[in-house]
Amino acid sequence: MSPGAAIQRVTVKGRTINIVTLHTWPQAYGFGVGSADQAASAANKEGDKYREFEIKYICAQTVNNPAYASCQDWLMMGDFNSRSRADNWYYGYPENDTRLLVHNHILDHTDLKDIIAERYPGSFISSTYGNARIDYMYASPSMYARIVNALTVMDKWTTATQSPYVSNFYDPSDPRPILADFELKQ
């Protein structure tokens, strides 16, 4: 896995919440592909296929892991570097487009809900400074039911400015933060 993923378990008001954070492979070419073969790898959509491998592994080790079968409260979030069929009305990709593989797996093989897509149906809310949503927050049904508010933060503190030091880098970051408030009663 590159860049990586982690699971954290926190207890709030007697509830154990399992939080999965991740950042999947960011390139169009496959992981470990040498520079001479990167164009061919990208043409074969190997970056998308590697991200699918990553999310299958992450789900198998966390939300779908029998060791966690008794755990109901889950959040999964991060930079997925992929598109979701929940936004495909906006993108217009073919249904079998490899850019949709990651979220197809989550939506078809877990009970996690895409917080932003569920809260704002029919609205496309970019998580980057362009017109892409590649950053997501998912919640299990028990956590989704406790959402008070959720939004993608777009304010003066999250407005990108090009770095004076690196031509393809932006401050503060290329993805915008997703903020969700939950009501956790005992």
Regions inferred by a protein language model and the residue ranges of each:
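Structured beta-strand-rich core segments of catalytic domains in phosphoester-bond hydrolases
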Residues: 1-29
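Extracytoplasmic/cell-surface-exposed regions of Actinobacterial cell-envelope-associated
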Residues: 8-11, 56-59, 66, 113-115
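Active-site metal-binding loops of divalent metal-dependent hydrolases
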Residues: 24, 79-80
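A solvent-exposed, charged loop/short amphipathic helix patch at secondary-structure junctions
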Residues: 29-49
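Beta-strand elements within well-structured catalytic alpha/beta cores of enzymes
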Residues: 19, 75-76
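A long, amphipathic alpha-helix that forms part
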Residues: 42-70
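A short secondary-structure junction signal
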Residues: 20, 30-34, 86-90
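Metal-dependent phosphoester-hydrolase catalytic domains
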Residues: 64-75, 82-186
